[in-house]
């Protein structure tokens, strides 16, 4: 970081002091500079006449370490709100993303608060994987001198609801830490639960920290360390943009319907980086709303209350409630409410409830187990509609005021009736070109190109997991980055499912893409996947890794990401001369060094 100094006659420092200050801070990150700024501010604001010789009193106040383990941004938002609450209470708090936390220092922590989301089949957020592994390893220290609290975020439509939060909570207690507050497990509608928990944990922490000490003011600014987005557009206040291109990029005979979507951001000034995600607010299909209303013998004109507003039922269902994802809780509550002879036997059997919810959309649950509900009872069953996140498939270095995404339209039949995913069918079928789309950027600092343009990059992205790597290549091409780039891509058929084929061929021809390995799972009798290609190219892959390459994986979390990681472990073990356990430690080190990054869902 370089700073243009003002004229020397305006500085309160002499040249020697200025040189020492610049030398001491030249390699500081923005986070560290913010902390130092707050620390000196605190020193300045001690009582008049006080003499500051050394920050000796600062260590008397236990710092609250607030760890954000976020996958889609919700955990980060809760953690940032708690940080602000703690600062307002004049408590010393240090907010850190789990991926940046030096987890071996946990034994020296006095107060730890974890806000943890869950992904996939009960796995921790990507940025928290290394910390999770460390705590569950033999290297984890005893934490007898530590007190902690955990807030978990999850989605009850998944079997392992809030499992990551449960893991952190149980393991910290097992290691000897004192639980300050019972863990809270919050569903997608987490805001009220989070607000209540924040108030409770602030009160608990205030009772643990000595009062009225100068060190509190000196350290309180250390919590204000996260970069704050200056964009006026957020999840709560999205940009109303325009859909300019909706192009099917799979072949006529493909079993998949994948769309290349381009959205015009106009003069909004909305900025993003390769690796970020686009949040899309969608509306439910009016035909689906009509079908559900009629199945329940309702009219759709009934008035219901939504967040303090009175709306017609049909409008509320189209704009405000999730209709395409069923959950075990919804099934259980519907069964109890309607006394359904079909569904009541499932109540109490978690596995059966989960399976039924995963295979039976809400509208078909009502069709198979009909009942008559009033409008408010229906609304009470449903969860609020939430935006969907899509990996961004473009770089503003090339597309400027546009953002591109790659959308796999979810389509299936239930007993001959066509069903579709909420957001994907909205984008693929119901938004006309030049139609309005409400969007926002979800920044993802855990999926970034190397800072050094000479660093080699290995990208593994089957299916729509290819999206962020299109952004990566646009960025590397625009910067004329000399680093080598290697892409692994897979899909069922070469002729029908080679997404962005012409672009990849052009990048190869121009030398931007150094090599590409393709896996077509259905073009031959034996299925071939990207993980098979990784093993096939193991020696070269290991050579790239040894040469400092960064590894990136994007796509399905439940199967692909696990299979790819297993293949990577086998390659590292075989060609690195390690056993699997040592290879796992090696891969964990790559993760800590930000050389192994995943965007999985």
Swiss-Prot record:
One GO cellular component term noted in the UniProt record for this chain: cytosol
Where do the annotations place FAD binding?
324, 358, 388-391, 406-408, 421-424, 601
Pfam families registered for this protein in UniProt: FAD_binding_1, Flavodoxin_1, NAD_binding_1
SUPFAM superfamilies, from UniProt? Ferredoxin reductase-like, C-terminal NADP-linked domain, Flavoproteins, Riboflavin synthase domain-like
Please report the stretch or stretches of sequence annotated as the Flavodoxin-like domain: 64-202
The cofactor named in the record is: FAD; FMN
Which CDD domains does the UniProt record give?
A: SiR (cd06199)
Similarity comment text for this entry = Belongs to the NADPH-dependent sulphite reductase flavoprotein subunit CysJ family. In the N-terminal section; belongs to the flavodoxin family.
Q: What GO molecular function terms would the record report?
A: flavin adenine dinucleotide binding; FMN binding; sulfite reductase (NADPH) activity
Which species is the source of this protein? Answer: Enterobacter sp. (strain 638)
Show the catalytic activity: hydrogen sulfide + 3 NADP(+) + 3 H2O = sulfite + 3 NADPH + 4 H(+)
* Example of a GO biological process term: cysteine biosynthetic process
Q: What InterPro entries does this protein map onto?
A: CysJ, CysJ-like_FAD-binding, CysJ_Proteobact, FAD-bd_FR_type, Flavdoxin-like, Flavodoxin/NO_synth, Flavoprot_Pyr_Nucl_cyt_Rdtase, Flavoprotein-like_sf
Q: Give the protein's recorded name.
A: Sulfite reductase [NADPH] flavoprotein alpha-component
Cofactor remark from the record:
Binds 1 FAD per subunit. Binds 1 FMN per subunit.
Which pathway or pathways does this protein act in? Sulfur metabolism; hydrogen sulfide biosynthesis; hydrogen sulfide from sulfite (NADPH route): step 1/1
Domain called FAD-binding FR-type: residue spans: 236-450
Residues the record lists as binding FMN: 70-75, 117-120, 153-162
- The domain of life is Bacteria
Assembly information from the UniProt record: Alpha(8)-beta(8). The alpha component is a flavoprotein, the beta component is a hemoprotein.
């Amino acid at each position: 970081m370089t700073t243009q100094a003002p004229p020397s006659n305006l500085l309160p420092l002499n040249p020697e002091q200025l040189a020492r200050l610049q030398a001491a801070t030249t390699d500081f990150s923005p986070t560290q500079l913010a902390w130092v700024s707050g620390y000196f501010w605190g020193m300045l604001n001690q009582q008049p006449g006080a003499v500051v010789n050394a920050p000796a009193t600062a260590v008397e106040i236990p710092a609250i370490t607030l760890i954000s383990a976020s996958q889609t941004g919700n955990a980060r938002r809760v953690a940032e709100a708690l940080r602000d609450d703690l600062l307002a209470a004049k408590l010393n708090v240090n907010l850190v993303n789990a991926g940046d936390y030096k987890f071996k220092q946990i034994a020296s922590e006095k107060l730890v608060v974890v806000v943890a989301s869950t992904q996939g089949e009960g796995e921790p957020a990507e940025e928290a994987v290394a910390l999770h592994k460390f705590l569950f390893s033999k290297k984890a220290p005893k934490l007898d001198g530590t007190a902690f609290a955990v807030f978990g975020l999850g989605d009850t439509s998944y079997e392992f609801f809030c499992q990551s939060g449960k893991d952190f909570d149980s393991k910290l207690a097992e290691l000897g830490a004192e639980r300050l507050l019972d863990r809270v497990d919050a569903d997608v509608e987490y805001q009220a639960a989070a607000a209540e928990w924040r108030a409770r944990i602030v009160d608990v922490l205030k009772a643990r920290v000595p009062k009225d000490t100068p060190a509190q003011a000196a350290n309180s600014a250390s919590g204000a360390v996260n970069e704050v987005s200056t964009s006026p557009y957020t999840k709560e206040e999205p940009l109303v943009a325009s859909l300019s291109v909706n192009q099917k990029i799979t072949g006529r005979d493909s079993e998949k319907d994948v769309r290349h979507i381009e959205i015009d951001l106009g003069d909004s000034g909305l900025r993003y980086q390769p690796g970020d995600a686009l949040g899309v607010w969608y509306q439910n299909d009016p035909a689906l709303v009509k079908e559900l209303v009629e199945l329940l013998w309702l009219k759709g004109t009934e008035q219901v209350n939504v967040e303090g507003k009175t709306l017609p039922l049909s409008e509320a269902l189209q704009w405000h409630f999730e209709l395409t994802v069923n959950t075990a809780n919804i099934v259980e509550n519907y069964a109890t409410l309607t006394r359904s002879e079909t569904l009541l036997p499932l109540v109490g059997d978690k596995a059966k409830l989960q399976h039924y919810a995963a295979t039976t959309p809400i509208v078909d649950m009502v069709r198979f187990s009909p009942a008559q509900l009033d409008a408010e009872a229906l609304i009470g069953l449903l969860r609020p509609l939430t935006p969907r996140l899509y990996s961004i498939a473009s770089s503003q270095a090339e597309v400027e005021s546009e953002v591109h995404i790659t959308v796999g339209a979810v389509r299936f039949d239930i007993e001959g009736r066509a069903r579709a995913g909420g957001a994907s069918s909205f984008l693929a079928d119901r938004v006309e070109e030049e139609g309005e789309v409400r969007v926002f950027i979800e920044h993802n600092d855990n999926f970034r190109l190397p800072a050094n343009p000479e660093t080699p990059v290995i990208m593994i992205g089957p299916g729509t997991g290819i999206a962020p790597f299109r952004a990566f290549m646009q960025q590397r091409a625009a910067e004329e980055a000399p680093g080598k780039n290697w892409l692994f891509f897979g899909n069922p058929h070469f002729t029908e499912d080679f997404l962005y084929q012409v672009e990849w061929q052009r990048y190869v021809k121009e030398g931007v893409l150094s090599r590409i390995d393709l896996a077509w799972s259905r073009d031959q009798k034996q299925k071939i996947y990207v993980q098979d290609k990784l093993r096939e190219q193991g020696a070269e892959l290991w050579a790239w890794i040894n040469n400092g390459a960064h590894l990136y994986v994007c796509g399905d979390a439940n199967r692909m990401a696990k299979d790819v990681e297993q293949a990577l472990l086998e390659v590292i073990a075989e060609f690195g001369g390690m056993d699997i356990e040592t290879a796992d430690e090696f891969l964990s080190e790559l993760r800590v060094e930000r050389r192994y990054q995943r965007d999985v869902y």
